[in-house]
């Protein structure tokens, strides 16, 4: 599981506890300084598999305008830009270090005018209503400050008929859940949801055609919903 791997990398093999746990939690939730850069590059590599799997559950038009929320090191932005060759991709993150690393990862796309990366928060997205055909959230919704309200804020910036896709590498109730739950709930203090809770999250926010997919062997999940229209 990549989250645990990132934690071990941050801690340098130390036991997760006390100040070490606090430092690891801080870097996973909001990377900063040199340690944060290392975490972001690690995430770019470790999240590649689950990202490819998750994006396989959504249709992406060649001219889509796309937002990646919590863009981290920017690898998802790069993948999305390749999948929408006539479109444009925006990335936001509330970590300044993430914006720097994601911009470096996508500097060739930025230079061509096809990618824009900026500082921002999911709770108050810096975009007009009905801007995007697709909004993605890869390995990030765990940490959103007010998950139900933030999911509704995502809907605001979706165009009618647009799609919101959550992709995550773990979920509550997965195989060997006992190995991951302490890290997710007590170390990272993350929103650790079951598949049914992912479904309810989107349905309660007003999304339509909600689907939840799991890869039980790897413990991966993605949840997809559309704005009416």
Residues covered by each model-derived region:
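A short SAM/SAH-binding and catalytic strip from SAM-dependent methyltransferases
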Residues: 134-147
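N-terminal, positively charged/glycine-rich alpha-helical extensions of SAM-dependent methyltransferases
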Residues: 2-35
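C-terminal alpha-helical "lid/dimerization" subdomain adjacent to the S-adenosyl-L-methionine
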Residues: 23, 30-44, 163-224
């Amino acid at each position: 599981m990549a989250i645990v791997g990132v934690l071990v990398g941050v801690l340098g093999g130390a036991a997760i506890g006390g100040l070490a746990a606090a430092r690891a939690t801080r870097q996973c939730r909001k990377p900063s300084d040199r340690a944060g850069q290392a975490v972001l590059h690690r995430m770019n590599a470790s999240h590649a598999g689950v990202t490819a799997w998750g994006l396989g559950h959504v249709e992406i038009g060649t001219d889509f305008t796309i937002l990646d929320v919590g863009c981290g090191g920017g690898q998802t932005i790069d993948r999305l830009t390749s999948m929408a060759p006539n479109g444009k991709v925006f990335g936001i993150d509330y970590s300044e270090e993430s914006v720097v690393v994601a911009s470096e990862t996508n500097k060739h796309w930025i230079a061509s005018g096809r990618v824009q990366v900026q500082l921002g928060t999911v709770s108050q997205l810096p975009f007009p209503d009905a801007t995007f055909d697709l909004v993605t959230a890869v390995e990030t919704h765990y940490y959103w400050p007010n998950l139900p309200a933030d999911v509704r804020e995502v809907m605001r910036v979706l165009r009618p008929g647009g799609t919101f896709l959550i992709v995550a590498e773990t979920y509550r109730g997965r195989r060997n859940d006992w190995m991951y739950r302490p890290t997710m709930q007590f170390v990272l203090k993350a929103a650790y949801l079951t598949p049914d809770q992912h479904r309810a999250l989107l349905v309660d926010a007003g999304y339509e055609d909600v689907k939840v997919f799991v890869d039980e062997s790897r413990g991966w999940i993605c949840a997809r919903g559309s704005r009416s229209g």
